[in-house]
Amino acid sequence: MKHIKAIAFDLYGTLFDVHSVIDQCEKRFPGRGREVSTLWRQKQLEYTWLRSLMNRYVTFEQATEDALRYTCRHLGFALDDAACTVLCDAYLRLQAFPEVPPRLRELRNRGLQLAVLSNGSPHSIGAVVGNAGIRDEFDHLISVDPVRVYKPHDRAYGLAEEAFGLARTSILFVSSNGWDATGARYFGFPTCWINRGGNVFEEMGQTPDWDLLGIDEIVRLFDSAEGSAPSV
């Protein structure tokens, strides 16, 4: 791991639990909160991918709102503008996974540069990490907005190279999303897949370099590699 100089983290689902919006969904739709959250996230991802394919970019906030409105129509729920705003704002106050803040500090203390590389807008990324009190742990908060295309497009991953000023082989990419880890691997990043659910990886011609249960294991990865530099 001595060749790794920086780490780029995905935000949604990797550092932060996207389903921490369930509480707000449950308040609005009693007994159906988890169902709403699950379909909402599914459509949010689909809309970012489809818009990239169609070259019809909108901000992540807009894609999130569109996905919520679809979800409510699909499930037959009324959703006025005020309720839509409350629910979408919950995406700005996601809960970090418990191990994330202390492990980020440990990684920084090792001299590694850290960044978020997210499909979120600059505003949404800043709000999420700021509300969680971990903004200062990152050297860069990288949004795909400048290239107007979402991960897993190559141009999105290239933003991390530009921000760090490093070759992609020196940047470890970390994501809990199999499609994201696949895209990063095709781009040429050494890649950790955070596999909290014990799932099988996607069948798209790539495998992650490391299949880990959580962010804690990244620290242990560097611990075990001290004094050696295993190839990726």
UniProtKB/Swiss-Prot annotation:
One of its GO terms (molecular function) is (S)-2-haloacid dehalogenase activity. CDD domains: HAD_L2-DEX (cd02588). (S)-2-haloacid dehalogenases may be used for the biodegradation of halogenated substances and their derivatives which are widely used as pesticides, herbicides and other industrial products. The keyword Hydrolase applies. It is an enzyme of class 3 (hydrolase). It catalyses: an (S)-2-haloacid + H2O = a (2R)-2-hydroxycarboxylate + a halide anion + H(+); (S)-2-chloropropanoate + H2O = (R)-lactate + chloride + H(+). Signal peptide: none annotated. Catalyzes the hydrolytic dehalogenation of small (S)-2-haloalkanoic acids to yield the corresponding (R)-2-hydroxyalkanoic acids. Active with 2-halogenated carboxylic acids and converts only the S-isomer (or L-isomer) of 2-chloropropionic acid with inversion of configuration to produce R-lactate (or D-isomer). This is (S)-2-haloacid dehalogenase. It comes from Agrobacterium tumefaciens (strain RS5). The lineage of its organism: Bacteria, Pseudomonadati, Pseudomonadota, Alphaproteobacteria, Hyphomicrobiales.
